[in-house]
Amino acid sequence: MLRVNIVGIGPGNPKLLTGAALEAINQSTILIGDKRMLANFASEKRFYDTIKTAEICNICANANPEKDIVSILVSGDVGFFSLAKTISGKLPDCECVRFCGISSLVYFAQQLQMSWDDAKIISMHGRRQNFIEAVAHNEKVFALTGGENSPQALCAKLCRFGLGGVQVYVGENLSYDNENISSMKAKEAAQKQFSSLSVMMIINKDAKTLAHNVHGLNDDLFMRSKVPMTKQEIRAVSISKLMPQETDVIYDIGAGTGSCSIELALQAKRGMVYAFERNPEAVQLIEKNKELFGVENLTVIAGEASEKLEEMPVPDCVFIGGSGGNLCKMLDTIYAKNVNCRVVINAITVETLIEVVEYYKQHESYALDIVNVFAARAKKLGAYNLMMSQNPVYIMTALKKGE
């Protein structure tokens, strides 16, 4: 069986290699990694300049188990947002051994003379993360950057969400001769250019504890206008029925003020919410509430939802607060994308109730649950409190039978 070492080389400077990692590299006949990593090692070995999984697997398949030892060099530590996880799962016929390295987080914290055990850690390098939420609700955030998520781009995003005053430390080319560490406000960093090999530490002294952990936020927390809004009590029941998961792709059709969209985005922190709305005034309001709550995992889709659904990503669950008269057509499109999609439909008219019931009579593989919610709020009138009723709402939940 071919021996494959997966070696964490730290931030890059060979002086920071562990003794065990250096020994594993020295014993190897084949080294695989990018050009920057390979440059520090002896030329008598066979070098392969690649970090593509398919190419690495092919090299290992053609190696001689009797003569060769392969070392795959990965940056940082093998357990910290590393290629090691992907590679080891693709080499079942090899003996894979991991060697730890110094991660960029550990090295950068050392250079800043700062502890890191209290930091929120996120990777923006080829990943989708709710960066704004992390910074808004954590005093210290460490971020790996890369690609379109450069330090300047991330700081520009902070500025758009009202966080331009947070303190930012940027570490460029860590451990190399041209290492540079700078400190400034996010609004200043947004105007600068940084190396493609950069990490960030963000300090937000005004971080707010994330209290949005229940369904049914107070209506007064949202920016409002004459645009219809799903009230707190109805929202609480509807979202509970929808059962959003942290990584879900969610549609909110007929989003109105965006109150449901906001709550869903807060629940699906590592997912994405698409708010469909045809009213231009409501579209602007959703954008304002998006900025107010700092939910960047919310995308507003302006126009008729029935005309937009085909091009959208596959949904895990869908909330329909308004259909524009195209309810059955939209449900057909949704189920064509995902037959197991969880669907919650709110209605205030008997006609919509009948339409939904008739639809699911024709689609017997789904179980339809109907709840009619009556809510009333107290209103002060002199020395008395009068209960003022809201419109009753039918909350209809459709789940695939057996789910």
Q: Where are these predicted regions, by residue range?
A:
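Conserved S-adenosyl-L-methionine
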Residues: 266-273, 337-339
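Conserved class I S-adenosyl-L-methionine
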Residues: 247-256
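A contiguous loop/helix-start segment that scaffolds small-molecule binding in enzyme catalytic cores
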Residues: 2-8, 19, 50, 68-70, ...
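Class I SAM-dependent methyltransferase SAM-binding "motif I" and its flanking Rossmann-like core
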Residues: 13, 76-138, 306, 364-386, ...
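C-terminal substrate-binding/active-site "lid" region of AdoMet-derived donor-dependent transferases
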Residues: 335-389
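Conserved SAM-binding loop
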Residues: 286-287
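Conserved SAM-binding loop of SAM-dependent methyltransferases across substrates and taxa
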Residues: 257-269
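Class I S-adenosyl-L-methionine
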Residues: 1-99, 106, 270-273, 277, ...
